[in-house]
């Protein structure tokens, strides 16, 4: 089974906001309003936009190349965040090693190359995850 021995401290120390992630990736932060989407869906769309940028930055390899999950490598570890949702609030439960298969229930853009990165993202960006996963009907 493959494991990665990368030091994830650089990424977690560098990426503490959406803007930090954009800077690390060398892209300009954008703030789309998703006006073409139903108003109730906009917070989720904005959060997803930010999360994929943040996760891409967190998953950068030490050589600054992007990590892209390879579903052809059966034993490549991939991690996802598991949430408990109670009273419309998120509670971080754990990260799970996602086995490679043709079935990707959580979406490959939201996977992590290591458990520490997944745990960091869950804690640091909990509000974004909540906006992405929960419909706020207020």
Whereabouts are the PLM-identified features?
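Aromatic/pi-system hotspot detector in well-structured domains
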Residues: 54-64, 79-88, 112
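Assembly/interface hotspot detector across virion components, adhesins/toxins, and nucleic-acid enzymes
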Residues: 3, 16, 72, 81-84
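Charge-rich, low-complexity N-terminal segments
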Residues: 1-44
């Amino acid at each position: 089974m493959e494991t990665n021995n990368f030091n994830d401290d650089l990424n977690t120390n560098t990426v503490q906001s959406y803007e930090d992630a954009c800077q690390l990736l060398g892209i300009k932060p954008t703030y789309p309003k998703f006006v073409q989407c139903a108003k109730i869906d906009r917070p989720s769309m904005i959060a997803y936009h930010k999360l994929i940028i943040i996760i891409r930055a967190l998953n950068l390899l030490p050589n600054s190349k992007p990590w892209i999950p390879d579903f052809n490598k059966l034993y490549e570890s991939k991690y996802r965040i598991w949430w408990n949702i109670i009273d419309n609030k998120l509670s971080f439960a754990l990260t799970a090693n996602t086995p490679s298969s043709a079935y990707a229930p959580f979406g490959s853009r939201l996977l992590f190359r290591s458990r520490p990165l997944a745990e960091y993202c869950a804690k640091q960006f909990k509000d974004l995850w909540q906006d992405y996963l929960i419909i706020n009907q207020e």
